[in-house]
Amino acid sequence: MIVGHGIDLQEIEAITKAYERNQRFAERVLTEQELLLFKGISNPKRQMSFLTGRWAAKEAYSKALGTGIGKVNFHDIEILSDDKGAPLITKEPFNGKSFVSISHSGNYAQASVILEEEK
């Protein structure tokens, strides 16, 4: 049974500006594993797209939980990739199944998270 659904849309340029003001912004949003992936991306635009996608996914996750960021921290949620490259939530505070989708189009990243109670 679905117990939560969250969606977030984020402008890549806004996250890029936040990162340019303070590069520690990435450390605030990303876990150690996510940060390794981020630093391994050589193309700056692709790097910002990755960071924005993870931001949007974590915001969507917090909305699906019904708490928003604050009650749950960015580092409480980790999104890596499965063997096919699709995003996969690998660390989370929810005790059930979780599903995430991240899309990029133009100057935007969008994410959707569904939380499902296990029977």
Swiss-Prot record:
Main location: cytoplasm
Family annotation (SUPFAM superfamilies): 4'-phosphopantetheinyl transferase
Residues that coordinate or bind Mg(2+): D8, E59
EC code: 2.7.8.7
GO molecular function terms attached to this record: holo-[acyl-carrier-protein] synthase activity; magnesium ion binding
Domain of life: Bacteria
Known cofactor(s): Mg(2+)
Keyword Cell inner membrane carried by entry: no
Keyword Lipid metabolism found: yes
InterPro entries the record matches: 4-PPantetheinyl_Trfase_dom, 4-PPantetheinyl_Trfase_dom_sf, ACPS, Ppantetheine-prot_Trfase_dom
GO CC list: cytoplasm
GO biological process: fatty acid biosynthetic process
Coiled-coil ranges per UniProt: none
Keywords: Cytoplasm, Fatty acid biosynthesis, Fatty acid metabolism, Lipid biosynthesis, Lipid metabolism, Magnesium, Metal-binding, Transferase
First-tier enzyme category under EC: transferase
Catalysed reactions, as listed in the record: apo-[ACP] + CoA = holo-[ACP] + adenosine 3',5'-bisphosphate + H(+)
Compartmental location: Cytoplasm
NCBIfam families: acpS (TIGR00516), pantethn_trn (TIGR00556)
Family: Belongs to the P-Pant transferase superfamily. AcpS family.
Function summary: Transfers the 4'-phosphopantetheine moiety from coenzyme A to a Ser of acyl-carrier-protein.
Name recorded for this polypeptide: Holo-[acyl-carrier-protein] synthase
Organism: Streptococcus agalactiae serotype V (strain ATCC BAA-611 / 2603 V/R)
Chain's gene name: acpS
